[in-house]
A protein has these predicted regions:
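Active-site PLP attachment segment
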Residues: 171-210, 232-235
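PLP-dependent aminotransferase-like
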Residues: 67-156, 163
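Structural detector of well-ordered beta-strand residues that form the stable sheet scaffold
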Residues: 53, 78, 99, 152-153, ...
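PLP-dependent aminotransferase class I/II
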Residues: 37-41, 46-52, 113, 125-129, ...
Length: 372
């Protein structure tokens, strides 16, 4: 009998234990250990970047990226409203102004057709966020960045193994970042990675993550930084996980496509796109959007699934509707109807790497009951 099916369960069945044990046996558990450098080099190579800078989580990677680009009080950054709060938080903490876009109703990524209308003389960067397993349409973003002299910050936190027109996500930004939270295709428990081809940005991020210690006069500081370091133990997990990334991508695609078959006959729900003209879905999560004609919303659907021992998670809540930003006077009068609908009608079901066929069958059966 299958018990509760969690929305995610990480898979740690490679060299994780061996590498972590090596850290403990040698005493190298801090950020100075060899696994940190190895993880940085191998991950950067995987996404075709010159530099990898390991940090303690994906959110701080955004803070460091914004700081490294010297984004400040006179600047605006364009980004999707349908994203995690870390994106806007990094901009606000830098004293800059976030400017949000609505999203595409089918890919759930930022609507790139809206970008140019949002550009002003104060715009310094576009922050793209690849959502839930499909990438942003990058060609228009790159074209606009070149036309207006803007930087691209690429949030690839959910995009491990994802490609756009055959090129790795994470390779498009002036500076890009990844997350290694337990629900990602690569996990270090907590962790993140900044990648870039720019030597100056890489040096700046390395300094910022390490309290801006100086090479020769360690405790004399020319600037303020943070302790954003990744430990050797975390990096050891990352190296082991990276070794199995192709296997993990294949498993995610299998889960997504099997769900597509199992759920295809349920009326009044929108399933994820398997592919677009420029990408193939890696199904980081398996999202479902209820039709407006459904008599209940995502919150009620998740309650009904929970009663059947099925875990689920709501979609992002739009940034322009966040109470904390309303108190700051941000996004007054902003309307993003697609994101607002996705937030109320969207949720995702169990799709972790440890998911079994038997568990998927149970989820599908519960979905049939809930949606009937």
């Amino acid at each position: 009998m299958i018990n509760f099916v969690p929305v995610n369960e990480p898979l740690l069945n490679g060299n994780e234990l061996t590498y972590v044990q090596k850290c403990i046996e040698t005493g190298w558990i801090s950020s100075d250990g060899s696994f940190v450098r190895r993880f940085e080099e191998e991950f950067a190579m995987r996404v075709d970047r010159k530099h990898g800078i390991a940090v303690c989580n994906g959110s701080v990677a955004l803070d460091a990226a914004v700081a490294a680009l010297d984004i400040g009080t006179e600047d605006e950054v364009i980004l999707p409203t349908f994203t995690i709060i870390s994106c806007v938080s990094a901009i606000v903490r830098a004293g800059a102004t976030p400017v949000v876009l609505d999203c595409d109703p089918y890919t759930w990524n930022m609507d790139v057709s809206q970008i140019e209308d949002k550009i002003t003389p104060r715009t310094k960067a576009i922050m793209v966020v690849h959502i839930y397993g499909l990438p942003v349409d990058m060609d228009p973003v790159i074209s606009l960045s070149e036309k207006y002299g803007l930087k691209i910050i690429e949030d690839a936190a959910e995009a491990h193994g994802l490609t756009y027109k055959g090129k790795a996500c994470g390779s498009f930004g002036d500076i890009s970042m990844f997350s290694f939270y337990p629900n990602k295709l690569i996990t270090t428990g907590e962790g993140g990675m900044i990648v870039t081809d720019d030597d100056h940005l890489a040096d700046r991020c390395r300094s910022l993550r390490n309290l801006c210690f100086q090479p020769k006069r360690r405790f004399v500081h020319e600037d303020l930084g943070w302790n954003f370091r990744m430990s050797n133990i975390q990096a050891a997990l990352g190296v082991a996980q990276l070794e199995r990334l192709d296997e993990s991508i294949a498993k995610k695609k299998y889960i997504g496509r099997r769900y597509n078959e199992l759920l295809s006959d349920i009326p009044r729900i929108q399933l994820p796109l398997d592919r677009t003209d420029y990408a193939e879905n890696v199904y980081w999560v398996y999202g479902i959007v209820l039709d407006n004609k459904m008599q209940f919303d995502a919150e009620e659907a998740m309650r009904r699934l929970a009663r059947r021992d099925i875990g689920s998670r709501p979609f992002f809540w739009p940034m322009h509707e966040q109470p904390v930003f309303k108190k700051m006077g941000l996004f007054n009068g902003e309307s993003c109807p697609v994101a607002e609908r996705l937030a109320r009608q969207g949720f995702y079901i169990p799709s972790g790497l440890a998911l079994t066929d038997e568990q998927m069958d149970k989820v599908a059966e519960a979905m049939q009951e809930v949606m009937s």
